[in-house]
């Protein structure tokens, strides 16, 4: 059933109808459309369009339809309706007859779809926040269990300084906490109702839009009808949050893919999140992580696509805005799936402490400690940096770690070096000295875990 046929003397070409119709994707707004229609029916009572009895009849029919949709959502796609609004209205008329045709009084699909989409966004943000916090909790638990797992930290993918696996986990907790904050901020800005703004100029009925917003669970009503029906900032904000969040998950995946290689060997992934090869029987591939990394690109694409769609649109509503949904639905679905999968990866991960320790002892990760030692002895840092560089070259030549060079060898580079240097060069000393806030010392890591646990509840 088309909602606009009176103006036209010819039927739409079937090819145009297929091109124009949006039911194949906006069916996902069915529940929100019905909830919005119930609230609108209440508003129509306040301005005398509906009687209380008529409203009750409409609300009952809409609630029955809501339960029917929840029980069998696939029925929507069996229809040839143009969009979800047409489908809901058609089903309502089937149930209550002519009364159903009164519901759209004073309402446009422009404010209707804007309301539906915001309601869907609110519901989905709630799911994303839950999944985000679950992954944070999984990371914190993994950190708590691996505070003593010393491993090399990297810059330029070269061993740099020793850290712990716990400290690595907590780095991603910080990223996810920022993602959580971005979602909460976006939620505040989208929590305003456009319903009652009509096509673009507002409704001719003196509806209390603040009351209507409250019935729908919004914090308030929007202030400008032109902006309200054409605003898709909330779509851009959520796509941006998803794009950033997926970058974080992609980096998380890349780190673990590397840690899981035979060359690194720091972790073993569970069989539950890996697959094999059809040819090579020895293979155990990190498919879950590779897919997280790969899916990052489609989310970035959705954000870029939506920005390009909106950038040249004049006020107010344009059919281009129908393109807001598919990318948004896919991007947020993808982000949600990847958050769940990342938590599943952590659920069965095994940290190989001996191999982590061995790798941390290689690569001269304690070179900075020797430089700091020289500074403490009064050597200017730039000179100390040069001295340690020369000592590392000699250690490499001899195939030894710095701490295995005899004192006589070390003193060739600086006479201030004494026997007290050797405790300084131990991995534990390297960790203990990083005791400033945010550092890798055991005390700081324990405090960071406690802080995260308290924040996450």
Swiss-Prot record:
Source taxon at top rank: Bacteria
PROSITE patterns on file: FUMARATE_LYASES
Pathway per the UniProt entry: Amino-acid biosynthesis; L-arginine biosynthesis; L-arginine from L-ornithine and carbamoyl phosphate: step 3/3
Gene Ontology terms: biological process: arginine biosynthetic process via ornithine; L-arginine biosynthetic process
GO molecular function, one term: argininosuccinate lyase activity
EC number(s) per entry: 4.3.2.1
InterPro entries referenced in this protein's UniProt entry, alphabetically: Arg_succ_lyase_C, Argininosuccinate_lyase, Fumarase/histidase_N, Fumarate_lyase_CS, Fumarate_lyase_fam, Fumarate_lyase_N, L-Aspartase-like
Any GO CC annotation of this UniProt entry: cytosol
Keyword flag Cytoplasm: yes
Family annotation (Gene3D superfamilies): Fumarase/aspartase (C-terminal domain) (1.10.40.30), Fumarase/aspartase (Central domain) (1.20.200.10), Fumarase/aspartase (N-terminal domain) (1.10.275.10)
Principal localisation: cytoplasm
Catalytic activity of the protein: 2-(N(omega)-L-arginino)succinate = fumarate + L-arginine
Protein location: Cytoplasm
Keyword set, alphabetical order: Amino-acid biosynthesis, Arginine biosynthesis, Cytoplasm, Lyase
Family statement drawn from the similarity comment of this UniProt entry: Belongs to the lyase 1 family. Argininosuccinate lyase subfamily.
PANTHER family from the UniProt entry: ARGININOSUCCINATE LYASE
Protein name, entry field: Argininosuccinate lyase
């Amino acid at each position: 059933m088309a909602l606009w046929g009176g103006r036209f003397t010819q039927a739409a070409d079937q090819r145009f109808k297929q091109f124009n119709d949006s039911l194949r994707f906006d069916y996902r707004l069915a529940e929100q459309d019905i909830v919005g229609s119930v609230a609108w029916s209440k508003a129509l009572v306040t301005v005398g369009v509906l009687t209380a009895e008529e409203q009750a009849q409409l609300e009952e029919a809409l609630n029955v339809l809501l339960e029917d949709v929840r029980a069998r959502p696939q029925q929507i796609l069996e229809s040839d309706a143009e969009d979800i609004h047409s489908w809901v209205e058609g089903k309502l008329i089937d149930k209550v007859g002519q009364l159903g045709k009164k519901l759209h009084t004073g309402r446009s699909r422009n404010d209707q779809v804007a309301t539906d989409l915001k309601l869907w966004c609110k519901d989905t943000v709630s799911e994303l926040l839950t999944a985000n916090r679950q992954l944070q909790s999984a990371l914190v638990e993994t950190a708590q269990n691996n505070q003593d797992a010393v491993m090399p930290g990297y810059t330029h993918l070269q061993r740099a300084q020793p850290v712990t696996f716990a400290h690595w986990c907590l780095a991603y907790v910080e990223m996810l906490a920022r993602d959580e904050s971005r979602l909460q901020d976006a939620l505040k800005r989208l929590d305003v109702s456009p319903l009652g703004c009509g096509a673009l100029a507002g409704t001719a009925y003196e509806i209390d839009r603040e009351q209507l917003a409250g019935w729908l669970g919004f914090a308030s009503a929007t202030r400008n009808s032109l902006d309200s029906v054409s605003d898709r900032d909330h779509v851009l904000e959520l796509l941006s949050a998803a794009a950033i969040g997926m970058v974080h998950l992609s980096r998380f995946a890349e780190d673990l893919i590397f840690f899981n290689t035979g060359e690194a060997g720091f972790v073993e992934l569970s069989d539950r999140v890996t697959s094999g090869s059809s040819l090579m029987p020895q293979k155990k591939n990190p498919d879950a992580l590779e897919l997280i990394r790969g899916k990052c690109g489609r989310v970035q694409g959705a954000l870029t696509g939506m920005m390009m769609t909106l950038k040249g649109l004049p006020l107010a509503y344009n059919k281009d805005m129908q393109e807001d949904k598919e990318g948004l639905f896919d991007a947020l679905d993808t982000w949600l799936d990847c958050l769940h999968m990342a938590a599943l990866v952590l659920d069965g991960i095994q940290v190989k402490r001996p191999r982590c320790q061995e790798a941390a002892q290689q690569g001269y990760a304690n070179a900075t400690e020797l430089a700091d030692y020289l500074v403490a002895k009064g050597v200017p840092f730039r000179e100390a940096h040069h001295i340690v560089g020369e000592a590392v070259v000699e250690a490499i030549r001899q195939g030894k770690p710095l701490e295995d060079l005899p004192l006589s060898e070390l003193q060739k580079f600086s006479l201030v070096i004494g026997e007290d240097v050797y405790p300084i060069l131990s991995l534990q000393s390297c960790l203990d000295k990083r005791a400033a806030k945010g550092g890798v010392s055991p005390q700081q890591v324990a405090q960071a875990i406690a802080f995260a646990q308290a924040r996450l509840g």
